[in-house]
């Protein structure tokens, strides 16, 4: 035995123990910090609550978005993006072409350039790093000269769900609390079926279907050459009907327009749809929120079904159960532009769309 072993001092062990305790304390503080930071960055659209502390993160410059034209050359009211969805980023959005050299993004609405695209596109040379967005809410038959746009655009923005920026005509969102609307007042539904149509083409699929349907069922048609529908009275008029013919003028994937989201759902009428497939509609709506013409072998069978629902209140009301948890929302130009703003905030890579025509048609 080493005679000096009994006399070996103990303080090095105390120092090691103190060091271990200190490291443990540092680790606890570090992981607590990580947990709080992760909670603050969940991606929730809500702004951080009760945030009185100063943020030391450098402020990111506000991005500048230029509208090449107002949609259909009609100015629209713009809102701050952070007011539309609290907690989200803002951009400066303008139609003033003088800011073109400084713009981070240019939104080009196809309808307003399609008569002569190359002469109506933004001028060359394009500022370095500037992104161009092809924006369109019309179906392929209404979009001419797409082939002239090859390799000009960086992002797509449309009603198609496979767009870089998805801008549907409407959507459903959960109620934040209890539904704010009263139950459906059936006594106010004094009429059966309505259809408001402005673009009447006798050889179109929807007009042909209507003509077969109305041989078995009374349908009140509003619009040119039909019943007048004074401006400002549309919702009041359509709200009297139990069913609304949400017949699209073109049958293409995801092309589900205001005919359903506004004319039918905002009027609390059950939509009878003619458009893409039932499975396509069910990507955006509960299966019991609408009636699809494809569910019936003939317009006569559909007419019989609507007449049955008219007499069976319980079955008719079953088409409104989804409203207990969901509510319909309709698009706005301002919100669509804000979606482009948020995409620009998130998307760092620079890409080029080789062919708009090959993708969209």
Swiss-Prot record:
Pathway: Protein modification; protein glycosylation. Residues 39-58 are annotated as: Disordered. The chain crosses the membrane at residues 16-34. It is a single-pass type II membrane protein. Glycosylated. Glycans are attached at residues 154, 185. Highly expressed in stomach, colon, small intestine, lung and kidney and to a lesser extent in salivary gland, bladder, uterus and liver. It catalyses: a beta-D-galactosyl-(1->3)-N-acetyl-beta-D-glucosaminyl derivative + GDP-beta-L-fucose = a beta-D-galactosyl-(1->3)-[alpha-L-fucosyl-(1->4)]-N-acetyl-beta-D-glucosaminyl derivative + GDP + H(+); an N-acetyl-alpha-neuraminyl-(2->3)-beta-D-galactosyl-(1->4)-N-acetyl-beta-D-glucosaminyl derivative + GDP-beta-L-fucose = an alpha-Neu5Ac-(2->3)-beta-D-Gal-(1->4)-[alpha-L-Fuc-(1->3)]-beta-D-GlcNAc derivative + GDP + H(+); a beta-D-galactosyl-(1->4)-N-acetyl-beta-D-glucosaminyl derivative + GDP-beta-L-fucose = a beta-D-galactosyl-(1->4)-[alpha-L-fucosyl-(1->3)]-N-acetyl-beta-D-glucosaminyl derivative + GDP + H(+); an alpha-Neu5Ac-(2->3)-beta-D-Gal-(1->4)-beta-D-GlcNAc-(1->3)-beta-D-Gal-(1->4)-[alpha-L-Fuc-(1->3)]-beta-D-GlcNAc derivative + GDP-beta-L-fucose = an alpha-Neu5Ac-(2->3)-beta-D-Gal-(1->4)-[alpha-L-Fuc-(1->3)]-beta-D-GlcNAc-(1->3)-beta-D-Gal-(1->4)-[alpha-L-Fuc-(1->3)]-beta-D-GlcNAc derivative + GDP + H(+). Keywords: Blood group antigen, Glycoprotein, Glycosyltransferase, Golgi apparatus, Lipid metabolism, Membrane, Signal-anchor, Transferase, Transmembrane, Transmembrane helix. GO terms for cellular component: extracellular exosome; Golgi cisterna membrane; Golgi membrane; membrane. It is an enzyme of class 2 (transferase). Its main location: Golgi. Its EC number is 2.4.1.65, 2.4.1.152, 2.4.1.-. Changing residue 223 to R: In Le(-) individuals; Loss of alpha (1,3/1,4)fucosyltransferase activity. Residues 35-361 are lumenal. One of its GO terms (biological process) is regulation of cell migration. It is found in: Golgi apparatus, Golgi stack membrane. Pfam families: Glyco_tran_10_N (PF17039), Glyco_transf_10 (PF00852). GO terms for molecular function: 3-galactosyl-N-acetylglucosaminide 4-alpha-L-fucosyltransferase activity; 4-galactosyl-N-acetylglucosaminide 3-alpha-L-fucosyltransferase activity; alpha-(1->3)-fucosyltransferase activity; fucosyltransferase activity. Residues 1-15 are cytoplasmic. InterPro entries: Glyco_tran_10_C (IPR055270), Glyco_tran_10_N (IPR031481), Glyco_trans_10 (IPR001503), GT10-like_C_sf (IPR038577). Catalyzes the transfer of L-fucose, from a guanosine diphosphate-beta-L-fucose, to both the subterminal N-acetyl glucosamine (GlcNAc) of type 1 chain (beta-D-Gal-(1->3)-beta-D-GlcNAc) glycolipids and oligosaccharides via an alpha(1,4) linkage, and the subterminal glucose (Glc) or GlcNAc of type 2 chain (beta-D-Gal-(1->4)-beta-D-GlcNAc) oligosaccharides via an alpha(1,3) linkage, independently of the presence of terminal alpha-L-fucosyl-(1,2) moieties on the terminal galactose of these acceptors. Belongs to the glycosyltransferase 10 family. This is 3-galactosyl-N-acetylglucosaminide 4-alpha-L-fucosyltransferase FUT3. It comes from Homo sapiens (Human). The gene is FUT3.
